[in-house]
């Protein structure tokens, strides 16, 4: 995974000049948008643990002024299947990733090379369980620097670096590099399309006592 991120960075560094998100005219709402979708998903031999299960995912995102948002809520074992690998596990996992555009906030074009826009980036992750009853409970808050980077074929790719605060242990614990993309690559006559969507999260610098 480390090599994948390095390759992405090198690819971005050699990509074509970018169309910057210019807010110098004061109109911070000109790029506003919002979207939401529901997906019924199936996981097969999902790592770690080779877990197979179904889940409902509500995914959403958008832009309003200086704020950019992406998030999702997963509800596991929706059919309450007794043979599911998620029986007895946390029912819900939530991720929210709000970012504040420094370009829009300051009115200064901060683009350079393939970097289209710069953000103060944050990420919140919860699974709805209590650390006292579940030693693997997820309660993380992350803060750092984010960007939109233009990459050949993929187009705009989010690339963020966070410091991680473990809300359960009340302590800072390492860092995370995250990248995400959404690339429509085949279009139908009715306007629908097939897309390639994904993300990579790479954690490093974790404390031994929490690993």
Q: Residues of each region from the PLM?
A:
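Cleavable N-terminal export/targeting peptides
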Residues: 1-31
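Hydrophobic, lipid-facing positions within transmembrane beta-strands of outer-membrane proteins
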Residues: 36, 54-58, 94-96, 141-145, ...
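Transmembrane beta-strands of outer-membrane beta-barrel pores
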Residues: 40-46, 75-79, 122-130, 161-167, ...
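Outer-membrane beta-barrel proteins
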Residues: 47, 80-82, 107-109, 129-133, ...
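Surface-exposed loop and membrane-interface regions of Gram-negative outer-membrane beta-barrel proteins
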Residues: 72-131
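Detector for outer-membrane/organellar transmembrane beta-barrel domains
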Residues: 136-211
């Amino acid at each position: 995974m480390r090599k994948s991120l390095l390759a992405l960075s090198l690819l971005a560094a050699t990509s074509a000049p970018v169309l910057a998100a210019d807010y110098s005219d004061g109109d911070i709402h000109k790029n506003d948008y919002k979207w939401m979708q529901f997906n019924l998903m199936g996981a097969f031999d999902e790592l770690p643990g080779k877990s197979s299960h179904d889940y409902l995912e509500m995914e959403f995102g958008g832009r309003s002024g200086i704020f950019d948002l992406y998030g999702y809520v997963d509800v596991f074992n929706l059919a309450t299947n007794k043979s599911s690998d998620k029986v007895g596990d946390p029912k819900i996992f939530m991720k929210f990733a709000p970012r504040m555009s420094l370009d829009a906030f300051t009115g200064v074009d901060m683009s350079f090379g393939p970097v289209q826009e710069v953000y103060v980036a944050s990420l919140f992750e919860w699974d709805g369980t209590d650390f006292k009853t579940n030693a693997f409970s997820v309660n993380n808050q992350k803060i750092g620097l984010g960007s939109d980077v233009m990459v050949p074929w993929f187009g705009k790719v989010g690339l963020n670096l966070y410091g991680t605060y473990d809300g359960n242990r009340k302590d800072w614990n390492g860092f995370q590099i995250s990248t995400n993309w959404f690339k429509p690559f085949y279009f139908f006559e009715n306007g629908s399309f097939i897309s390639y969507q994904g993300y990579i999260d790479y954690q490093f610098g974790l404390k031994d006592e929490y690993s």
